[in-house]
Amino acid sequence: MTADKPRETKAQTPERVGERLLRIGVILAVAAVGFQTLAHLTNEFLLDDRVEGLDADVEGNAFTWAGSAAVFAVAIAALLHFVAFRERRREFLLVLGVATLFSLDDATQIHERIALKVGEDLLGLPDYAAVRLWLLFYLPLLLLMGALLWILAEHVWGPGGRALRLGLGLLVASIPVEIVGLVTRPLSEDGHEAPDDLRVAVEEGLELGGWVLAAAGLTAAVAVALMRFRQD
């Protein structure tokens, strides 16, 4: 009998671990967006919008939870970096605070309630216009978060920073798609539902994919930084 040869294993370098985390993040983003889009369009075009659990535009279902969890993952990654390192602590603390607020808001629909209260009750706007006032109310926070993520992407591990910026790009792209609802929602109320159904699928997909990629990029960057620190 011959002795078994020891298996050759690749060293778990920080970069290798970071790349693995990024691959997982990309796969998760594609799978989540694909499933959400397929479920939403199936419900709208084949099930006549009868299943609220499959509607990406309905608050309080599994898709809401997924979006809120993705935002909270960004907050957790920022917290880990804030606790472990002294570099860019102020920026990571701000990301932690804003991402936590966004996650809570996404789960409880605070922004929509405020927008509808002001838009409908005070300004007399139709609901499809009133609900989009949240973009104005939250504009300072949106700009702050975008600037923070862009800045941090320059100072973290390269591939993680690129994933972070890609996620940010998807989130920015979702805003004009949201605004298009000012046109497609009235069409939906007049019986032409397909344009708004497709718009919702695109908007929600961009948001979910953007937050998942941002979380994956920041998590991978923090993991690489922690492993490098341990090696030193």
Regions found by a protein language model. Give the residues of each.
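Hydrophobic alpha-helical segments at protein termini of multi-pass membrane proteins
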Residues: T2-D232
